[in-house]
């Protein structure tokens, strides 16, 4: 479907500069409170409003502001408090840090109220919600960014820089993943930072496929210029059966415990293969219920080079044969192609002693672009494309791993657009 006369694409959308970005945050659980603390470190921001259904969490947030010597924010409580916050006229940007199922409804309402939105991952849970985000962003001409911090991983940025400079040749295949042993977390209480009786755990009881694709997929799509010179066309997906969560529960709680008897639809390991319009491939994995060491893979295969972050950073260049670079040779390449974001903003994060460089670079770039009237690094099409894999991977798994088409959320504009 092409753009209609009354609604056009928002690729490279830019707005007049906002000197001080006035921020509201919806959701002040663990993620929301961390978001609040992060943006107190970013110049040119003002935390104006906070919305949370649990008054105790709202009080925690106000205390964080007080201890940082910032003014108290306007607080909104109750089930409808977030709507009232979206409707106020003294906010520019709203962060949505709530459970997955509320991301899209809140984001679309905020945009309809004239606000830019930044959504925690994933931005949407199904194709219908992905289209709602795209259509609303196009109709309202508001920024809609999904906060995928893994796109700002220093190694991912280095390989992106190498690809942009042609060092890796034509990029043919990319791999990404979310591999993280969360078994103990799934049986820990929320007060302990866990997910017992948490919406994330409930999702694994009711669904299969890949419910959390964006950490691995975001950097992969950026290096392949998805919707900027190519697009994802279709996928096939398959999952193992589920055993890891049940076995862990039996050992910890006993054979006949409610935890051990709980059934899960989500397989232990999901693998999804994606084919692009220009003949490139992406392999995406999800695995949170085995003792497999943490990994996002971050594998890039080009005609002139290879790069992979996990389990240890590895680069091989055609000019050196197929032997991975080591020692000084590896450090020389990593230094030569260090992305400007890492060399400037990332180094600033280190000087400040901040614990997560990826978050700081992402946060800095978002506010920098808004303050300078620039297009954002990630747009609503990224949010839709990366999030839609949740529903589509499940559909493929449940139907014998059949190929499933991936919508073109740009309605054909990707053919005309270069990064």
Swiss-Prot record:
GO MF, one annotated term: nucleotide binding
Keyword NAD among record annotations: yes
Class of the enzyme per the UniProt entry, highest EC level: hydrolase
Cofactor: NAD(+)
Entry's cofactor comment: Binds 1 NAD(+) per subunit. The NAD(+) cannot dissociate.
Stretches of the chain forming a coiled coil according to its record: none
Binding locations of NAD(+): 30-31, 52, 100-103, 120-121, 149, 195-199, 212
Pfam families membership: GFO_IDH_MocA (PF01408), Glyco_hydro_109_C (PF21252)
Binding sites annotated in the UniProt record for substrate: 178, 212-215, 294
E.C. numbers: 3.2.1.-
Keyword check for Hydrolase: yes
Similarity annotation: Belongs to the Gfo/Idh/MocA family. Glycosyl hydrolase 109 subfamily.
Chain's role: Glycosidase.
Cited PANTHER family: BCDNA.GH03377, GLYCOSYL HYDROLASE FAMILY 109 PROTEIN
Protein known as: Glycosyl hydrolase family 109 protein 2
């Amino acid at each position: 479907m092409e753009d209609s006369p009354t609604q056009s694409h928002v690729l490279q959308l830019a707005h007049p500069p906002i000197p001080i970005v006035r921020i509201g945050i919806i959701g002040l659980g663990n993620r929301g409170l961390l978001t609040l603390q992060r943006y107190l470190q970013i110049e040119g921001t003002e935390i104006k409003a906070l919305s949370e259904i649990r008054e105790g969490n709202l009080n925690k947030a106000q205390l964080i502001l007080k201890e940082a010597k910032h003014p108290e924010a306007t607080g909104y409580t109750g089930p409808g408090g977030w709507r009232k916050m979206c409707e106020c006229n003294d906010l520019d940007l709203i962060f949505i840090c709530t459970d997955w199922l509320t991301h899209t409804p809140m984001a679309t309402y905020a945009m309809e109220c004239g606000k830019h939105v930044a959504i925690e991952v994933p931005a949407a849970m199904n194709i219908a919600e992905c289209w709602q985000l795209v259509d609303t962003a196009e109709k309202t001409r508001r920024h809609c960014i999904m906060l995928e911090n893994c796109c700002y991983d220093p190694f991912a940025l280095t390989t992106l820089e190498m690809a942009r400079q042609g060092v890796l040749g034509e990029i043919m295949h990319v791999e990404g993943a979310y591999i993280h042993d969360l078994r103990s977390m799934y049986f820990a209480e929320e007060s302990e930072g866990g997910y017992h009786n948490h919406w994330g755990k409930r999702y694994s009881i009711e669904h299969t496929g890949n419910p959390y694709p964006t950490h691995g997929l975001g950097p992969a799509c950026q290096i392949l210029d998805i919707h900027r010179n190519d697009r994802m066309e279709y996928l096939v997906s398959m999952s193992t059966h589920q055993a890891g969560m049940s076995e862990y529960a039996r050992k910890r709680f006993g054979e006949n415990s409610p935890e051990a008897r709980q059934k899960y639809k989500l397989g232990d390991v999901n693998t999804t293969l994606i084919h692009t319009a220009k003949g490139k491939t992406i392999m995406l994995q999800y695995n949170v219920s085995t003792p497999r060491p943490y990994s996002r893979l971050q594998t890039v295969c080009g005609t002139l080079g290879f790069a992979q972050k996990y389990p240890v950073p590895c680069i091989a260049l055609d000019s050196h044969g197929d032997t991975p670079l080591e020692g000084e040779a590896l450090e020389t390449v990593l230094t030569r192609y260090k992305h400007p974001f890492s060399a400037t903003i990332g180094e600033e994060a280190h000087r400040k002693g901040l614990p997560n460089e990826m978050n700081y670079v992402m946060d800095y770039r978002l506010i920098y672009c808004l303050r300078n009237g620039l297009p954002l690094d990630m747009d609503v099409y990224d949010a839709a494309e990366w999030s839609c894999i949740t529903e589509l991977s499940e559909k493929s798994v449940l139907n014998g791993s059949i190929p499933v088409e991936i919508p073109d959320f740009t309605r054909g504009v990707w053919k005309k657009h270069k990064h």
